[in-house]
């Protein structure tokens, strides 16, 4: 298991854009399972929607991508690199995510070739699918 400090050592995201609270399981370069506790205090709920708060679907996908990035960047040879979001395919949203929900974020890499990886990603709440998609990552280095 990785706590928030360990996650911050692997991926560069920070508040308000760090969307993973802990990682329950990680197989370096292969798969990871993370958790996002969705609270009423999330910044995005100020505008989406004030009278009926719903987590934006794009942020659910971003949370999945961050869990995938942890899996990719946990590998020794990828440490210190960045995992860029390079693509999304077959994305479907099946359930609203609201304050008080706990998102379980599962990403399994299905293909990795060099600096490019593709994975199957599923976000669930209480065992119910909220989002499922395929995401593509491109590993890169920081350019000064």
UniProtKB/Swiss-Prot annotation:
One Pfam family, short name: FabA
UniProt keyword Signal present: no
Catalytic site positions: 48
UniProt-recorded name of the protein: 3-hydroxyacyl-[acyl-carrier-protein] dehydratase FabZ
GO biological process, one term: lipid A biosynthetic process
Function: Involved in unsaturated fatty acids biosynthesis. Catalyzes the dehydration of short chain beta-hydroxyacyl-ACPs and long chain saturated and unsaturated beta-hydroxyacyl-ACPs.
MF terms in GO: (3R)-hydroxyacyl-[acyl-carrier-protein] dehydratase activity
Keywords of the record: Cytoplasm, Lipid A biosynthesis, Lipid biosynthesis, Lipid metabolism, Lyase
Enzymatic reactions: a (3R)-hydroxyacyl-[ACP] = a (2E)-enoyl-[ACP] + H2O
Gene this chain is encoded by: fabZ
Listed EC numbers: 4.2.1.59
Family as reported in the entry's similarity comment: Belongs to the thioester dehydratase family. FabZ subfamily.
